[in-house]
Swiss-Prot record:
Record keyword Magnesium present: no
Subunit structure comment from the entry: The glycine cleavage system is composed of four proteins: P, T, L and H. In this organism, the P 'protein' is a heterodimer of two subunits.
Reactions it catalyzes: N(6)-[(R)-lipoyl]-L-lysyl-[glycine-cleavage complex H protein] + glycine + H(+) = N(6)-[(R)-S(8)-aminomethyldihydrolipoyl]-L-lysyl-[glycine-cleavage complex H protein] + CO2
Family to which this protein belongs: Belongs to the GcvP family. N-terminal subunit subfamily.
Keywords noted in UniProt: Oxidoreductase
Lineage: Bacteria, Bacillati, Bacillota, Bacilli, Bacillales
Name of the protein this chain belongs to: Probable glycine dehydrogenase (decarboxylating) subunit 1
Pfam families per record: GDC-P
TM regions (residue ranges): none
A biological process term (GO) from this entry: glycine decarboxylation via glycine cleavage system
Single GO molecular function: glycine dehydrogenase (decarboxylating) activity
Signal peptide start and end residues: none
Keyword Methyltransferase: no
Assigned EC number: 1.4.4.2
Length: 447
């Protein structure tokens, strides 16, 4: 057999060409000058059999540092967490895996209910009233929150803490430029937002203040103090939060946050180069009609049975593009499903235990670093990340660790000149005592 897969036969081609009124495929490219058309055969190797191809690809993949063979202490927004086995089984079912936006509720009840459950669990974690069906990732969720605030308050200035993830701030800058909004960064002090600087910057021109909880350095921000400053001028208070941390920390909603956003990656979504992720967006009832993205609501059908539908669709671009609250289109439904299944499998106590283990193992790692003579830069409370002064380029340290099958922490000098030679170390529930001890000992040996 010459070709294993036949996308179309010669008869199919002939019928398609006749339908559009041409005789040959070459006629489709008649607008391209002959002088620039490629002639001859491409220098492509001969086709391989499936076993040969699988062997070659496996050999190529074996060159990658994967988390089955390497202990990872790299976080900075993407974390190596446990995902219950059932997650992959459920999201691989064809009715979920291939489904698109469920515009027809009569044939999409399974997907709609799954999204509704995701929204419900996000509300429970964040302490907010309503959540959407997901965003692309935490960065776009943050930017969309700022756009909502600017539109609601009709103000042009956005204050964002420098302790917010640098990549999320970059996405915010991109959104703001197109809307002619001014983004002002509030410096951090001792690893958290400088409240004195924040107090001096908040005035009646500020649409919102954005902080991260825990922040990019792993530190837990003082949300109660920040909220008082923000709401003095009737600005909106936006908090970006790691949802897993909310299994242990007081939810932002309890501190008066107006919008809580973040990335659901810690729940069932693996680490992978470039994503995809799953942003979440939760807010109070006051902003329910301004929230971006899909919203699934619970209702009853003509027989009085419980059902689920897309609701408040007039906000969306497929209804009124020029009046839409956002131009975000397809949500991350499959990843939201993964997060839902992971949270459901863990249960409330499981999420709490997972968060507790992150805290306890990170605290153990901190103590071991200090015992080895390292300086842990910030003294405040943290969740599962903290900053270590390496006294030498972090890249050199990480290159050495990689030889020991360890993926080291994030090089803060990439984004903060004042934190050159500082490493952001992440310790999740998957890290063992032996792995933590090995990390500290290896770093101590090259200090």
């Amino acid at each position: 057999m010459l070709h294993r897969y036949l996308p179309m036969t010669e008869e199919d081609k002939k019928e398609m060409l006749q339908t559009i009124g041409v005789q040959t495929i070459d006629e489709l490219f008649s607008d391209i000058p002959e002088s620039v058309r490629f002639k001859g055969d491409l220098k492509i190797k001969e086709a391989k059999s499936e076993p040969e191809l699988l062997k070659e690809l496996s050999q190529m993949a074996s060159k990658n540092a994967n988390l089955k063979e390497y202990a990872s202490f790299l976080g900075a927004g993407v974390y190596d967490h446990y995902a219950p086995v059932i997650v992959d089984h459920v999201i691989s079912r064809s009715e979920f895996y291939t489904a698109y936006t469920p515009y027809q509720p009569e044939i999409s009840q399974g997907e709609l209910q799954a999204i509704f459950e995701f929204q419900t669990m996000i509300c429970e974690l964040t302490g907010m009233d309503v959540a959407n069906s997901s965003m692309y990732d935490g960065g776009t969720a943050l930017a969309e929150a700022a756009m909502l605030a600017a539109g609601h308050t009709r103000k042009k200035k956005i204050l964002v803490s420098s302790a917010v993830h640098p990549e999320s701030r970059a996405v915010l800058e991109t959104y703001a430029k197109g809307q002619n909004l001014e983004v002002v960064e509030i410096n951090h002090k001792d690893g958290v937002t400088d409240l004195d600087v924040l107090q001096s910057e908040v005035d009646d021109t500020v649409a919102c203040v954005i902080v991260q909880y825990p922040n990019f350095f792993g530190q837990v921000e003082k949300l109660a103090d920040i909220e008082k400053i923000v709401h003095q001028q009737k600005s909106l208070f936006i908090v970006s939060s790691n949802p897993l941390s909310l299994g242990a920390l007081t939810p932002p909603g309890k501190f008066g946050a107006d919008i809580v956003i973040g990335d659901a990656q810690p729940f069932g979504i693996p680490t992978q180069f470039g994503g995809p992720h799953c942003g979440y967006f939760a807010t109070t009832k006051a902003f329910m009609r301004k929230i971006p993205g899909r919203l699934v609501g619970q209702t009853v059908d003509s027989d009085g049975k419980r059902g689920f539908v897309l609701t408040l669709q007039a906000r969306e671009q497929h209804i009124r593009r020029d009046k839409a609250t956002s131009n975000i289109c397809s949500n991350q439904a499959l990843n939201a499903l993964a997060a839902s299944v992971a949270m459901t499998a863990l249960g409330k106590q499981g999420v709490k235990e997972m968060a507790r283990q992150n805290i306890s193992k990170a605290q153990y790692a901190k103590r071991q670093f200090e015992a080895k003579g390292f300086t842990v830069t910030f003294a405040g409370p943290f969740f599962n990340e903290f900053v270590v002064d390496c006294k030498r380029p972090v890249k050199e340290v990480n290159d050495a660790l990689l030889q020991k099958n360890i993926i080291g922490g994030y090089d803060l000098g990439r984004d903060y000149k004042e934190h050159e030679n500082h490493m952001l170390v992440a310790v999740t529930e998957l890290r063992t005592k032996e792995e933590i001890d090995t990390l500290v000992n290896e770093m101590g040996a090259i200090q």
